[in-house]
Amino acid sequence: MQSLIQLEDITHLDRHPVEKSDELHVEWFIGKRCNYDCSYCHDLNHDNHSPHTDMTHIVNSIGKMFDRFQNKLQINFTGGEPTVHPEFGRLVDFLAECDINVSMTTNGTRKAEYYTDIYRAFNHITYSQHFEHAINDVFLPKMKYINEHRGERSMQIQVMYHAQHEDAVHEAIRYYEFHDIPYTVRRLRPTKNHKYPIQEAMHYSPEQLDNIKWFQASDTGHVPNVRVTAADQTHTVHTNELTGLGMRSFKGWMCLAGVNFIRVHDNLVYRCWGEFRTPIGDITDPDFQLLTEARPCIANKCVCAPEISTRKWRV
């Protein structure tokens, strides 16, 4: 990619394939409760005591969105750990009755059969492997079982490359490659975590950084998801290739976040994670409306693939 695209030439980003451009993508943070306590997880994203989100509000809000957007609605549930919500089964039953493109990110601690059952509600599940907690002897066979029983639904393992657990990381990658299980490799970044102010998980050696780049270039989970216009040419790539170029900040660009991309966190709606201090509404408000036009980005960086691939252009 570096031979095809120069960072300074990029003028426009949009989702790929093109039919996804007008979808409403919702990153839905279902709650901070989590059964893990990873040293590199942001304080805002996890704890073991926050109250659970009211599932009635979630179900009702999704129903209203579905009435408006129908098959143009795409939702990804995150946390915390979504499956620890005591009423998560109610959400699964509701989603299974709707024709909505729904995905979820989970730490994969439930039994394998649990996940193969809830695929009736989810088109895709991402299983994040956190090596401070997930033991290969347990986690790897579970992923193999799910891969063999998921039918036409899709999955992806997100291998969190922990600098202090390198042997386990490499063992997992070899296993996924041998058993043809889709995976991606994620480099850990510093976060605000009051319990772990010194975060050794991302104290990478130069060799480890080279390994991460090599794995990211050869892993099996990267499907092009963004169209990039650079020097009057259009390329389809994966967002990880853009972040590899150092492209995470679009401050000052015009962006459709708030129009066809939103984040829901504790019922408050945000354009994106970078504008977390400025909600644009409350998802439970019957009068809540999405924005109707692009606004300049005021965030310091995009934090995930759906944010990066939301339509934006340099001005």
Please give the residue ranges for each predicted region.
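Conserved alpha-helical substructure of the radical SAM core
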Residues: 2-105, 109-114
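Short, solvent-exposed loop/turn segments at secondary-structure junctions
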Residues: 35, 82, 109-110, 132, ...
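Short acidic, gly/pro-rich beta-turn/loop elements at beta-sheet edges
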Residues: 38, 114, 135-137, 167-169, ...
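Flexible loop residues that form catalytic
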Residues: 46, 130, 188
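Radical SAM/AdoMet-radical enzyme domain recognition
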Residues: 59-77, 85-176, 182
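Conserved C-terminal portion of the radical SAM core fold
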Residues: 124, 135-240
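Accessory C-terminal segments flanking Radical SAM cores
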Residues: 190-315
